[in-house]
């Protein structure tokens, strides 16, 4: 019987964060304690499918796309209350979301920054002013085809998604600095 020793490799971006970025942030903000340095908590990828209220099969495509992009099974989000104007009933599926933590989060962020964002047509950078006041950043993508995991021929319809990066930063300035060091391509105002 042989014992296979599996060596887990640390994600590239996580290694860069620990070895370089923490030191740069400590130097820039004069943190006394290394635990004060802001870091990433989780990334939430949300895909709203409002048309699923009329055609329930549309949610399956969104779930399949999110699972392919993130490598994790999405949670189907259902309507919490009925709204007659939208022909929406309580309990109908209206979206899907995935919460990424740990190594999956770092690997997704690496793929997003190095492969997906550069593939966007006419991309001039992300808006650096859209932080929420606590150092968390949310932005939207208009189509799922920028991710190379999605097969262009199997796309049934174009779907956008919201991506929220939750950090431990206490201010927008700290959060922006962390994201800039991680490689987020912010527009120069």
Curated annotation (Swiss-Prot):
InterPro entries: Ribosomal_uL5, Ribosomal_uL5_bac-type, Ribosomal_uL5_C, Ribosomal_uL5_dom_sf, Ribosomal_uL5_N
A GO MF label: tRNA binding
Keywords recorded for this protein, A-Z: Ribonucleoprotein, Ribosomal protein, RNA-binding, rRNA-binding, tRNA-binding
Gene Ontology BP term (one): translation
GO cellular component, one term: ribonucleoprotein complex
Keyword GTP-binding: no
PANTHER family linked: 60S RIBOSOMAL PROTEIN L11-RELATED
Assembly and binders: Part of the 50S ribosomal subunit; part of the 5S rRNA/L5/L18/L25 subcomplex. Contacts the 5S rRNA and the P site tRNA. Forms a bridge to the 30S subunit in the 70S ribosome.
Role summary: This is one of the proteins that bind and probably mediate the attachment of the 5S RNA into the large ribosomal subunit, where it forms part of the central protuberance. In the 70S ribosome it contacts protein S13 of the 30S subunit (bridge B1b), connecting the 2 subunits; this bridge is implicated in subunit movement. Contacts the P site tRNA; the 5S rRNA and some of its associated proteins might help stabilize positioning of ribosome-bound tRNAs.
Family named by the database record: Belongs to the universal ribosomal protein uL5 family.
Name listed for the protein in its UniProt record: Large ribosomal subunit protein uL5
Gene that specifies this protein: rplE
